[in-house]
Amino acid sequence: MAAPADDEFEDAPDVEPLEPTLSNVIDQRSLRWIFVGGKGGVGKTTCSCSLAVQLSRVRESVLIISTDPAHNISDAFDQKFSKVPTKVRGYDNLFAMEIDPSLGVAELPDEIFEEDNMLSMGKKMMQEAMSAFPGIDEAMSYAEVMRLVKGMNFSVVVFDTAPTGHTLRLLNFPTIVERGLGRLMQIKNQISPFISQMCNMLGLGDMNADQLASKLEETLPVIRSVSEQFKDPEQTTFICVCIAEFLSLYETERLIQELAKCSIDTHNIIVNQLVFPEPEKPCRMCEARHKIQSKYLDQMEDLYEDFHIAKLPLLPHEVRGAENVNTFSKLLLEPYKPPSGK
């Protein structure tokens, strides 16, 4: 007689936990796009800059892009960056740039349009067209960045993303752009009288409606190519950064579910700012914090047993400047060893 079903699992081996580092990401040479994101204030920028540093040691050329309007990578490396890729001091193959995708037609100053009623009407019509698809101006900004970056042939691009909502729009930008361009193509004849003046004002030269439509259509193949790459786990992955607190854990779960809907690969989580009490220096607050964090860490390890979960410590100092980022980056590859317990 067959053994009871429960007995079948008694001798089943425990699932080995995955390595608690980002070595799998560093070693995956096929990756071209790596996104680092999560809730605000969890240390995404420090982690993304550290990841870029480690990648620069094994790849020919690495670009880190900040899509967060706060532009913290300038603070992290203690070096001013712009919307043009700039070499990070101390590195030969690591570049950084900062963009603000939220700037679009709606952000153009009204003073430019005040002297010409035709231009003023044109701006309003373009804004109306953009509003038909929320996020199209932001998505077009992403599209232009992707077009430029693809032409630069970096080995891998790391995105230091804005908080979760912006990040999801970034990942969905190919769909938004396709819909938005379709809408703009439908109304191109309506806005034709204004296009030439608008293009001259924006420094795009003399251009009629058909020429503009042609340029927009040229963008679509790049958008579709990037969209396909984003959904290819061999080329794209997303690293979630969080802290061991309820709200951050909740946000991480929501983010992972949304990534799954977008068919974006994710199998790495960084739990940052962990407190490890020192036996020689008793601290009631540290002990209490450690207890709370341990509870959520246990939940994460149960919930994400098929993820690489890297655990990084809360440091007594800011991680700022290339040297400090370089030191911190080693924690991505070597599990942190807290002070020995009592």
Curated annotation (Swiss-Prot):
Catalytic class of the enzyme: hydrolase
EC identifiers of the protein: 3.6.4.-
Gene Ontology biological-process annotations: protein insertion into ER membrane
A Gene Ontology cellular-component term: nucleolus
Protein residues bound to Zn(2+): C283, C286
Gene3D superfamilies documented for this protein: P-loop containing nucleotide triphosphate hydrolases
CDD domains: ArsA
SUPFAM superfamilies recorded: P-loop containing nucleoside triphosphate hydrolases
Gene Ontology molecular function: ATP binding; ATP hydrolysis activity; metal ion binding
UniProt cross-references to Pfam families, sorted A to Z: ArsA_ATPase (PF02374)
InterPro entries membership: Anion-transp_ATPase-like_dom (IPR025723), ATPase_ArsA/GET3 (IPR016300), ATPase_ArsA/GET3_euk (IPR027542), P-loop_NTPase (IPR027417)
Protein location: Cytoplasm; Endoplasmic reticulum; Nucleus, Nucleolus
Active site feature: D68
Keyword field: ATP-binding, Cytoplasm, Endoplasmic reticulum, Hydrolase, Metal-binding, Nucleotide-binding, Nucleus, Transport, Zinc
Reaction(s) the record says it catalyses: ATP + H2O = ADP + phosphate + H(+)
Domain of life: Eukaryota
Assembly: Homodimer. Component of the Golgi to ER traffic (GET) complex, which is composed of GET1/WRB, CAMLG/GET2 and GET3/TRC40. Within the complex, CAMLG and GET1 form a heterotetramer which is stabilized by phosphatidylinositol binding and which binds to the GET3 homodimer.
NCBIfam families named among the record's database cross-references: GET3_arsA_TRC40
Its job: ATPase required for the post-translational delivery of tail-anchored (TA) proteins to the endoplasmic reticulum. Recognizes and selectively binds the transmembrane domain of TA proteins in the cytosol. This complex then targets to the endoplasmic reticulum by membrane-bound receptors GET1/WRB and CAMLG/GET2, where the tail-anchored protein is released for insertion. This process is regulated by ATP binding and hydrolysis. ATP binding drives the homodimer towards the closed dimer state, facilitating recognition of newly synthesized TA membrane proteins.
Similarity comment text for this entry: Belongs to the arsA ATPase family.
Protein's name in the database: ATPase GET3
